[in-house]
Amino acid sequence: NHVCNLYLQNKKLLPTKVIGYKHPGDKVYMSEKMVDMVIPLLKEQKYLNIVEKFNNQTVDVDLDLFRKIPMNFNLDEVRWYFHLTGVHTDLSNPYIEVKNHQKIKDKVVIMRSTRRKNIFINYKFINNYKDILFIGLEEEYLDLKKEIPNLEFYDCKNFLEAAEIIKSSKFFIGNSSFGFTIAEGLKIPRLMESFPEFPVIYPNGGLGYDFYFQVHFEH
């Protein structure tokens, strides 16, 4: 068992060749807002002793070196960090811990990026069910509400609250977005909408399933 300090560097510039790999116009790895959103979640993890913004603290392992490994820059699979630390762990076990949300519980929770939508999939049948909640960006919510008119929206104050809502859900549905990353770490029941152009994200362990076609999504 290890207890580590983690320092997050905000506004670090992306290499010129990969600018916009997350969103058009992105020029940094993590914005200050993104760092502020994720720190409360990371501070809840028992294996992290200190979590704060980087300010020239001593660093033993620079996790940004992951981006210098000779492989596709867009690969977001967490296991590739094993090759930096030399520590291999069982990714079928939970590696994120949070409490249940005090108020929002037993919802079907969705976070779906508009950039990674599967063109073979629609969510219209979900309108037949109740207690469907979207967390994430409002523009993404409005996009999905065209298919699910009774879809509700909640604006989380940070990723810790998002994780608490996901943990308290009936199950989670998402595509390649930070919401699925959280659900994957929690190992709660989850469905992953595979992205045809880059299907590299998939569940490991627990009640996790991915789908590529509509018939499998609905059944």
Q: Positions of the model-derived regions?
A:
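Catalytic machinery of carbohydrate-active enzymes
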Residues: 1-219
